[in-house]
């Protein structure tokens, strides 16, 4: 299944100029994908900006189902040192926000899949940050009795998610 083959609906662009800019930028894509991208860009300056910033990646990822694209974006953040983690997570956040929005607006995913994907990425982000920061503190000798083997478990640190995060219902608000 490709992204285009799974589309069931398209948003109507509020800003025709923004939609036209995206149609021109992505003129090489399938007509249905252009409808989705144009409608999305014409309703969300934020998502339009991501489309333009991540155009090369987006073209490649639209050949796959959204699950594969989102997993690829999330995976790119794993195994990084704390110095590189922040920028990698910001890039992954942009990419995942865009793909989740397109899957939602294109009718590919139900609401539970949308909120689940956002929650899963938030969970991964917190996990990666805790482990990277714990690793830094272990290297600095600031966690007595903890060694490199303890990084995988966050040296026993617990992050408790409640509310929307705990219920797996994170959204864009």
Where are these regions (language model features)?
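Non-catalytic regulatory/linker segments of enzymes
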Residues: 1-173
């Amino acid at each position: 299944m490709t992204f285009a083959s799974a589309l069931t609906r398209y948003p109507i662009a509020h800003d025709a100029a923004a939609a036209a800019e995206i149609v021109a930028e992505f003129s090489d894509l399938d007509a249905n994908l252009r409808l989705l991208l144009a409608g999305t860009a014409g309703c969300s300056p934020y998502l339009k900006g991501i489309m333009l910033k991540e155009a090369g990646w987006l073209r490649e990822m639209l050949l796959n189902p959204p699950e594969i694209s989102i997993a690829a974006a999330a995976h790119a953040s794993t195994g990084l040192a704390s110095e590189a983690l922040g920028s990698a997570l910001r890039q992954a956040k942009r990419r995942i926000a865009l793909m989740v929005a397109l899957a939602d607006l294109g009718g590919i995913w139900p609401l539970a899949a949308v909120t689940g994907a956002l929650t899963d990425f938030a969970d991964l982000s917190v996990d990666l940050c805790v482990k990277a920061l714990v690793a830094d503190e272990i290297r600095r000798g600031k966690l007595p009795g903890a060694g490199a083997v303890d990084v995988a478990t966050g040296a026993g640190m617990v992050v408790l998610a409640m509310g929307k995060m705990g219920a797996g219902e994170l959204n864009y608000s």
